[in-house]
Amino acid sequence: RSEKAIRRADICLLVIDIAAGITQQDRRIAGIIAEEGKPCIIIVNKFDLFHPNASRKDRMAEVEEQVRRELFFISYAPFIATSAKKAEGVEIIFKVITRIRRESHNLPTTGQLNRLIQLAQQMNPPGAASGSARRLKIYYATTAVDPKYNTIPVPRYVLFVNDKSLLTDSYSQYLRNKIREAYPAPGIPVIFSARSRVRND
């Protein structure tokens, strides 16, 4: 049931009972959100019960560290600390949803994406593949928006490369970070796919 709801959703709100800690069910749902490439907000509820005698700043820092460590696969998702019982932080959820909708329309064009990718390669060229002298070459990139995302466009960045098997997870993450630095879009995943293409030049 949760899988179907996630697939239908424009934005997924992952609610965590921080008093109980991050559970296996939370991780499972977060994994589905990541697999589906869905925009997401992490809502940390019952924040008032989390180390109530500590300062809010220290509590926020500890919660964020825990959330980012255990739910690293949805690191793009902003998190909001709330207390439903005290009605604290609830209004922020709607503000963040509005921001995600707005920022989703401020993503790089194909031309901007290619300039960014080329600059990223110049700054940090791909290393040789393990056990091989071959190196990844990214010829160009395109941006495609999946038609199933009607309200909030989620771009799919397609990289045309010499050999897609040379695109490592670490280099993909490097490119994601560069895109996020240039075009911050909290809550929106950065999704890559690679296609091998032979060039004669």
Language-model features and meaning:
Residues K4-L14, A19-D201:
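C-terminal-of-GTPase-core extension/linker across diverse P-loop GTPases
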